Amino acid sequence: MDFNLGYLGLHTRDFQASNGYNAADLHFRVNADNPSDTYFYYDASLDFRYGVQGLGELETLREAPAGALRTNDLDFRGSFGAVVRNRSRFLIDLAIGVSAYSALIEETDGIFAVTPKYVYNRGIADITLGAEIALKKSSKDKFQDFELNKAKGQIIYPDVHVNLAIVRNYFNFQAFATGGIERNTYSSLKETNHFFNPYYGLGHSALLDNTVEKYNVGGGFNGNIAGRFLYDVKFGYVRYGNA
């Protein structure tokens, strides 16, 4: 079991205004620790962040509602299933993410994803075969009639990984095909750009839209020659639905 509490404070000043963002973080995780060959596997985590973005000193900001921008970000991730003889896993991965904004804007955005998959690990092979089913839900701001997270994606995405140790430590081969939809939050944008302010185009910012990765395919090989020369070659191609 893992439990953490944290605080994030970002206080900035530029030529237009000074503002501050303060957030409290909570993280909780439980997972299976079973030495048996066959058992029920679980690994689940919960993350929550409550943040308040100050308005700063701009004249237009002084007319905004008290409390500036309040953010609530909740993320749950879990993997559950059966392990058979420590080499086969029949799993279901769950991912639920919700962001609720209040005061300056009133909007809620959420993504739900479920990924059934089979994992095989024996001998030279480590293989994962799965497919992610993802759904998006959001509401428009009732005051300004805009929607932060608009991109819906395609619902079904691949989740396939193949790793083969053809000649262990000398020639290893990897291939993968993945995809998915990711919710971009105000707090993550603020961590990337400390000077970002809610009035710097928040309602029309593509940076806050969902990121839709339609597919990401690639592979590679690595190893060594005679224990003296190391090599690692990778290749891939990714296509985004809203980039």
Give the ranges of each region predicted by the language model.
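Transmembrane beta-strands of outer-membrane beta-barrel pores
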Residues: 5-11, 48-54, 96-104, 120-124, ...
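Flexible loop and strand-edge segments within Gram-negative outer membrane beta-barrel domains
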Residues: 2-77, 101-104, 196
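Residues on the lipid-exposed face of transmembrane beta-strands in outer-membrane beta-barrel proteins
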Residues: 1, 26-34, 76-86, 114-122, ...
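Residues that define the transmembrane beta-barrel architecture of outer-membrane proteins
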Residues: 20-26, 68-76, 106-112, 152-158, ...
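Extended beta-sheet lipid-handling architectures
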Residues: 3, 94, 111-113, 126-130, ...
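Exposed, low-structure sequence patches enriched in small/polar residues
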Residues: 126, 144-145, 149-243
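Repeated loop/turn-to-beta-strand initiation elements of outer-membrane beta-barrel proteins
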Residues: 2, 35-43, 85-92, 122-129, ...
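Eukaryotic alpha-helical scaffold "rod" segments
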Residues: 67-111, 116-118
